[in-house]
Amino acid sequence: MKVLIIGANGQIGTQLVDKLKDSKHEPVPMVRKEEDLNTFKEKETEPVLADLEEDISHAFEGVDAVVFTAGSGADTGKDKTEAVDKKGAVKAINEAKSKGIDRFVMVSAFGADFEPKEWPDSMKHYYEAKAAADNHLISSGLNYTILKPGRLTDDSGNGKVDIGERTQERMGEIPREDVATTIREILDRPNTYQASYEMLEGDQPIAQAVERI
C-alpha cells in the first residue's frame, strides 16, 4: 500500500517513514520545504513537496492511504494551530475523499474528545482544533482510525501499549516510536476502521494489542 505521510518531518512522521520502508507498505513523505526533499530521497523514498496551508491536491495522486501526523504543537498560537491542526487536517480529509482514498489514519491528542470544561485554558485552542478535525473525519465516510496518544516522549519505544476506546489510566505518556509502530500495525487492519483509540505506554505488545481491539 502506498501511504502518504503528512507531517513526515515531525518526530512521529520521520520514524513512520523508516518503519514503513521496512514493511510491505511504501511511504510517500510530504514535506513543505525543498531542502527537505533530499533528506527523504536519501532514505530511498519519493517525497512530495506540498504545504498544508496551500494547494495539496497533487500530493494525493496515486496513493492508497493517508496518515496525518502534522501538528503545530500545543505551544503555538491560535492562528497557526487553526491553520494546521484544524483547516489543514480538514483539507487533507476532503482531498482524500475526492481522490477516492478511503483509508485515513489521524494522530490526534489524548483528551480531544473530553468535555471542553476539562481542557486547560492555555491549551483550549489546541484541543478545539483537534476535536474539530476528528469530528470531520468521523463524518467523512472514510475508513478512518483516530489515535489519541498521551504525552509524547522521545524515549525509545518498548513495543508495548495500553490502547482502547478508553485506556486504563486517565493520562500518561507514550514514546513517539511506539505511536509510529502502532500506525504501521493498524494501516491495513479492518478491525480498526471507523474507530478512535486512546493510547498510552502499557504492557501489551503492539501487534497483539492491535489484533484484540
Q: Which residue ranges define each predicted feature?
A:
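Conserved SDR Rossmann-fold cofactor-binding beta-strand/turn motif
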Residues: 31, 148-153
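Structural motif
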Residues: 2, 64-65, 103
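Active-site beta-alpha turn of Rossmann-fold NAD(P)-dependent dehydrogenases/reductases
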Residues: 70, 105-108, 150
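Non-catalytic, hydrophobic alpha-helical segments
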Residues: 12, 66, 147, 179-183, ...
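NAD(P)H-binding glycine-rich loop region in Rossmannoid oxidoreductase-like domains
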Residues: 29-98, 187-191, 197
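Conserved Rossmann-fold NAD(P)-dependent oxidoreductase catalytic core, especially the SDR/UDP-sugar
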Residues: 6, 26-30, 34, 76, ...
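Active-site-lining helix/loop region of Rossmann-like oxidoreductase modules
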Residues: 154-157, 161-213
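N-terminal Rossmann NAD(P)H-binding glycine-rich loop of SDR-like oxidoreductase domains
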Residues: 1-25
